[in-house]
Each structure stands twice: as structure tokens, then as C-alpha cells.
Amino acid sequence: MAKDIKFSEDARRAMLRGVDQLANAVKVTLGPKGRNVVLEKKFGSPLITNDGVTIAKEIELEDPFENMGAKLVSEVASKTNDVAGDGTTTATVLAQAMIQEGLKNVTAGANPVGVRRGIEKAVATAIEELKAISKPIESKESIAQVAAISSGDEEVGKLIAEAMERVGNDGVITIEESKGFATELDVVEGMQFDRGYTSPYMVTDSDKMEAVLEKPYILITDKKINNIQEILSVLEQVVQQGRPMLIIAEDVEGEAQATLVLNKLRGTFNVVAVKAPGFGDRRKAMLEDIAVLTGGQVITEDLGLELKTATVDQLGTANKVVVTKDDTTIVEGAGDSTQISARVNQIRAQMEETTSEFDREKLQERLAKLAGGVAVVKVGAATETELKERKLRIEDALNSTRAAVEEGIVAGGGTALVSIYNKVAALEAEGDVETGINIVLRSLEEPVRQIAHNAGLEGSVIVERLKHEAVGVGFNAANGEWVNMIDAGIVDPTKVTRSALQNASSVAALLLTTEAVVADQPDENGPAAGPDMGMGGMGGMM
């Protein structure tokens, strides 16, 4: 396919037009008085959101050169979202400011490579200063403040703070859509996995259709159990002790299943069988987790163990097990705390090594089941459109809170970026490097300027006053007052602010050093029709 090539000023200007179109659509959402953006969906109702990265991902421009500029800024938002989970609008605003200022200077004759060095030098200093003024997050109230600022809703803040208090920093908090109007929190304590009983005849409570086992023995194996003879020996030992039993196996079927159900109905013993969770290697790892949590062993040929020779000593135990049609929950497993800690550290090490987002998520779930618990925030709303918008805001709030726990908090509302202005301005440089530093200085003011603008105020006036205020004092755009931002609970996670600045400067510096842009020429004849495929002239239909 033929290509279009643009050089130097033409190339950069075309990309800037794309940057501006995307950034202008995103930045109207910034701050407490930011507006929403409506996104068309080909199927279903439109999506109304103020989430920067969601908006950025939806934007495709017709002009290929402009589209490349838009995609670069979309990358800033996506990368910030991947690292910190929030701050995507701030990152977009910073990137636009740096690119606009940078292109002015490059057009005026500045050397882009020198400008880039200046940007990198200024951002490195800015990040050091952000870390220096960062405060650790210690109380439930602080967590609630971070979540409330991100979601724009105090109730959501309290809900997320309670969830984190209940499941700990290692716990998993998931967000689901509720069928009702209210948003509520559901916490599962203990280890839960998504496998239920293999037969409904195993229930102990026919009203709730669940099996509750008090102080059961737990047999854990990766084998299929077809014949009752395979587990007869260990079953007899458990019956002698007069305690119930949970069997976790690849499957329990045929004669083994029938015998277990028959004896359960006769009242000979209380036993429940469930399938092992997960698949393949992940299944083995999860069975090992259950074994560590309950103080048992996985009966597997990999370790040279057989079901026929299994003893009570190899079984795990727990205070209580609840099994429903869909889930099994093990409460207060009797495993050794030292072994559980070692297993937790092993999973943490695997999380640091993996490059797959999916694997990391699954490892995080396993970690939560061992170390904390699982909390589910069920999001309710009157309409589907409101539900989607609310769910996105709560996801942002949760990510913000996690980032705050990790690296601490700084004054919110863009105040922290202006408060480090003087430290960055004190950097000594000359020529184009100094120009690069000045570009970053101008961009540090931009989030405050945009928040004020979205609140219907003159941003430059607010910025000038902010530079002369005491450290930590900022402008609360929600009510127009000047307050101590941290005392007022207007805070941003340090990680979010840092990531936004780093990613914005990275893309801005690359765009400024661009000298040629290559794009596909549009096909004037439109897309070619597909082959006929013997369908009588319907080849072009898709």
C-alpha cells in the first residue's frame, strides 16, 4: 500500500491537532466540577463517563496523522491507568501542555534533543520532590478520603475504606453489578473457590440448599475418584473419629458418588464432595494452597502418595466449611501460620516476576485467599447507563486507594504539582536544556488551571495565588475556598501523580523529537469487496 510522508513542522503540527482533539475531550472531566462525556455504542445505550482512559480509548480520528497524535496521548492515559489505576485525565492534561509548549519552542528554533534532556531533568527532580512531600496513609479515614475524592462520592469512600479494613491490603476487592438500586459491600472471610457440591443430596440445610460441616477433615487430591475402595480406608478412620469430611478431588463419580450419597442419606456419616478449582498447573497450585491453609497434604502421584494408603494425618482440617451449589468456603483452616506466611511470600515473588496481567490477577486472588479475604462491592443504580458510569467511578476509586496505600498521598487538586514548582525552577541549566525545564514548569500549573476552568473560574489567577500560599494550602474548586488540602481530605495518591507526570513527559519528549511521520494513504476506491465464495453476488456482505 502507498504511504503518505510528512516532515518536520508539517508532521508535528498534524500530530498536535490530534493531541488537542483527544485532550480537549478528556480534560473537561477534570476536578470536582468536571463534566461527563457521552460515548456512542453501536449496540445498547450510550456510555456516560468522566473516566479519562475510557474516553481516550474510544477516540479514532479520520486523518491518519492526527490519529497518530491522538493515539500517543491515549497511550499516556493507558499506561498511567495500568501502573496507578487512576490519574488518566491529569496525565492527558500534562502531556498536552508539554507538547504544546514544546512545539512552540521547537518551531522557534530550539533543538529538540536539548529540550528533551531538559524535560527529563526537570521531571526527575519533580518526582524526587513529590516523594519527599508524600505522607504515608495510616487511618481508615484517610483511605475513605482518597476513594471519595476519586469517585466524587463520600459513601463510596466509606464503602471502600471498610472493604480494605475487612480484607487487608492483600485482600481482593472485586466490583460487580447489583440487581438492586443500592450499592453494598459483601465480604467473604476465609478461602472461597467457585466449585459447589457434586450432588444436591449432600446438603445439610435443605432450605438454604447448602452443606455446613463443623470441624471437618479435608481430603485433597488431584485424582478422579470412581471407586469407593480407593478412599474406603481413610473414610473408616474419619467415621471412627465421628467428624464430617470434605473431599476435594478432580471429580467424584460413578459408584464412589452413589455410595457417599447413600451413606449420607442413611446418616452413617456426613460427607460432601466438590471438584478441585482451576485447571492444569493452576489447579495444582490452588490445591497446594488449600493444603497449606488447612494443614493437610495433596494426595498426588507427583509426591508418591496414593489414596488407598492415605491416613487421617494427611488430611487437612478447618473450623467450618460451607458448600453451596456454586461455591465452597473454608473458614479458619488449621494450617501452620509459618507455612502460610512462606506460601504468601512465594506467591508475592511470583507476582513480581510475571509479565502477564492475567497471571498477576490470578496470583493476587490466590494471595488474597491465603492472606486476607475477598470483598465484593455490588454496584446498584436505577438505569443501566448510570450503573456503567458508577461502576467505572468505583473502579477508579479502588485503584486510587490501592495506589495511596502503596506510596502515600500528597495534596490534591493539582496543588502538589504547583508546590514543587520552586524546587524544579531552581535547577541550573542553559540553552535548550533550560527551555525543556521551563516546559515542565508550565505544565505543572496546568492541572490546577484546568480544574479552575472547569469550575467556571480564571485558572491563571488561581495559579498565581497558589504559588504564594503556604505549603499544603490549595484551592477547593468544589466550594471556592482556600484550605489546607490534606486537612480538608482533598488528597491524591503520590503514585498516581508521579505516574501521570512520568508518562506524560515520556510521550511529549518523543513527539518533540519526531522529524518524519509515515501513514497509509487512504484508499479512494473504498474497501475492496471480498471474494464471491459461491454466494451469488453477496461477496461484499460482512
UniProtKB/Swiss-Prot annotation:
GO terms for biological process: protein refolding. ATP binds at residues 29-32, 86-90, 413, 476-478, 492. Gene3D superfamilies: GroEL, GroEL-like equatorial domain, TCP-1-like chaperonin intermediate domain. The keyword Transport does not apply. It is found in: Cytoplasm. Its EC number is 5.6.1.7. Residues 521-542 are annotated as: Disordered. It comes from the Bacteria. GO terms for molecular function: ATP binding; ATP-dependent protein folding chaperone; isomerase activity; unfolded protein binding. HAMAP family: CH60. Forms a cylinder of 14 subunits composed of two heptameric rings stacked back-to-back. Interacts with the co-chaperonin GroES. Together with its co-chaperonin GroES, plays an essential role in assisting protein folding. The GroEL-GroES system forms a nano-cage that allows encapsulation of the non-native substrate proteins and provides a physical environment optimized to promote and accelerate protein folding. This is Chaperonin GroEL. It comes from Listeria innocua serovar 6a (strain ATCC BAA-680 / CLIP 11262).
